[in-house]
Amino acid sequence: MKFAVIQFPGSNCDFDLLWAIRDVMGAEAEFVWHDEKSLAGFDGVLIPGGFSYGDYLRCGAIASFANIMPEIKRLAKEGKPVFGTCNGFQILVESGLLPGVLIRNEGLKFVSKWQALKVENNQSNFTTEYAKDALINLPIAHGEGQYVADEAQLAELKANGQIIFTYADENPNGSVENIAGIVNKEGNVLGMMPHPERAMEELLGGADGVDLFASVLKNFVGK
């Protein structure tokens, strides 16, 4: 598989994602600038964290209109894996690829730390390498990570098993139902606030992110 790591003005986790999928996991990947209009030859998309366009208007709002977005939506419609972490998650909800919205943290402060998570659904294409109900630790670093959805959206997320990760032990940002990561109905688009790409080696504090990327490579190869 060949992955496109999308770069926006203000992205700052792009090299982390490239390193995780290419250098640690051994997949083919390269950077693609946000102004490109084609993703021909790519089999998946990774959207990094950071502060795209300086977070003006809303986090991810301007990036959702970038020239590359129609191609990302095309790949998503074709069933290819699309993964967004932190600002990437914000871009996915702003572009309509995932339901709900992300707003300022409940405490109105930027939160940066290692956070315990629960794997709510280990049958998704992004989590089959995790044990059911596994507790994992991943870094978080965001100021606008409070996930909000209306009652109808929440009911649908629960009914379809779209809630993939929840915050365990404590809720760092006030997200409804402790939601940390969700997928679309089709199961090929994942957005999450935590950073699995920063948890790829024990030397860096933990390697609980490896199984997410391993799941992607196992479940999407050949699709």
From Swiss-Prot:
Its main location: cytoplasm. Residues 2-223 form the Glutamine amidotransferase type-1 domain. The active site is at C86, H195, E197. Keywords: ATP-binding, Cytoplasm, Glutamine amidotransferase, Hydrolase, Ligase, Nucleotide-binding, Purine biosynthesis. InterPro entries: Class_I_gatase-like (IPR029062), PRibForGlyAmidine_synth_PurQ (IPR010075). Coiled coil: none annotated. Gene3D superfamilies: 3.40.50.880. GO terms for biological process: 'de novo' IMP biosynthetic process. Its EC number is 6.3.5.3, 3.5.1.2. One of its GO terms (cellular component) is cytoplasm. The keyword Ligase applies. It is found in: Cytoplasm. Pathway: Purine metabolism; IMP biosynthesis via de novo pathway; 5-amino-1-(5-phospho-D-ribosyl)imidazole from N(2)-formyl-N(1)-(5-phospho-D-ribosyl)glycinamide: step 1/2. HAMAP family: PurQ. Part of the FGAM synthase complex composed of 1 PurL, 1 PurQ and 2 PurS subunits. This is Phosphoribosylformylglycinamidine synthase subunit PurQ.
